[in-house]
Design a protein with these regions (language model features):
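Short, Lys/Arg-enriched N-terminal segments with co-localized hydrophobic residues
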Residues: 1-2, 16
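Sec-dependent signal peptide recognition
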Residues: 4-12
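Hydrophobic h-region of N-terminal signal peptides that target proteins for export
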Residues: 12-20
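The right-handed parallel beta-helix/beta-solenoid scaffold, focusing on the short coil/turn
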Residues: 21, 43, 54, 61-63, ...
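Acidic Gly/Asp/Thr-rich repetitive segments characteristic of extracellular carbohydrate-active
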Residues: 21-53, 57
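Right-handed parallel beta-helix/beta-spiral solenoid domain characteristic of secreted/periplasmic
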Residues: 27, 62-119
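Right-handed parallel beta-helix
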Residues: 44, 67, 80, 101-113, ...
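Extracellular beta-strand/beta-solenoid scaffold signature
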Residues: 80-95, 118-133, 152-161, 177-188, ...
Length: 217
């Protein structure tokens, strides 16, 4: 007689569990960009009030970067948590396929003068996006003041969008200036930025002081 035995098979499944972390600036890392560089997707970066003289790039990460406004909705924190580019480059850059899981909230963005970019890839470089430069990206920007930025010989002093559809909620775009187009906003090449409860005022440009749209909506 032949005996058959069933030998149980045990399968072990190993799961990688990702835990989100909160990084505090300047307590943990003394610069916002340094915190972004150290972060992983789903992390939150909380920034104390102060003036941060730097330019930041989200580098495609799905993270939240916020002032302490995130904790208590105290609007006074927006005006005293400042990212200041010191008239060197764009204050904030999104150009690595960021989406709505990339969130910037509760800052004043000021004194950017645009970058030196060629989004058309035709060898012509211009200064775009003093406050925010957005190329091939769809981030979410909430409760920010975008002010006193420039972008001469290009445009989009406050915000520049190229093939991008960022969403802006509760933002103020004011006092931005360019001798080209789009003092507050310059959106082009299939861009569809959206604005909810936002205000544009005292923005200046040769054409389109508030906004200038080209092949965009």
């Amino acid at each position: 007689r032949i005996m058959y035995y069933k030998i149980p098979t045990i399968v072990f499944l190993f799961f990688h569990i990702a835990f989100s972390e909160t990084i505090y600036v300047p307590d943990d890392i003394n610069s916002i960009q340094g915190a972004i560089d150290a972060s992983e997707n789903s992390d939150t970066i909380l920034v104390d009030p102060g003036i941060y003289f730097e330019n930041i790039n989200f580098n495609g990460k799905s993270i939240v970067v916020s002032s302490k406004y995130l904790l208590n909705n105290d609007s006074l924190l927006i005006g005293i948590t400042i990212i200041d580019a010191g008239n060197v480059g764009s204050v904030v850059t999104f150009n690595n396929d960021e989406n709505s899981n990339t969130i910037l909230q509760g800052f004043t963005l000021q004194n950017g003068n645009g970058n030196n970019e060629d989004p058309d890839d035709n060898g012509s470089f211009y200064t775009y996006g003093g406050g925010i430069y957005c190329e091939n990206a769809d981030p979410l920007v909430k409760d920010c003041i975008i002010q006193n930025n420039t972008a001469n010989e290009g445009g989009g002093a406050g915000i520049f969008c190229f093939d991008s559809s960022p969403a802006f909620i509760g933002c103020i775009i004011k006092g931005n200036e360019t001798d080209d187009v789009g003092g507050g906003l310059y959106a082009r090449d299939n861009s569809s930025p959206s604005f909810s409860n936002c205000s544009f005022f005292e923005n200046l440009a040769e054409f389109g002081g508030g906004c200038y749209l080209k092949s965009s909506s």
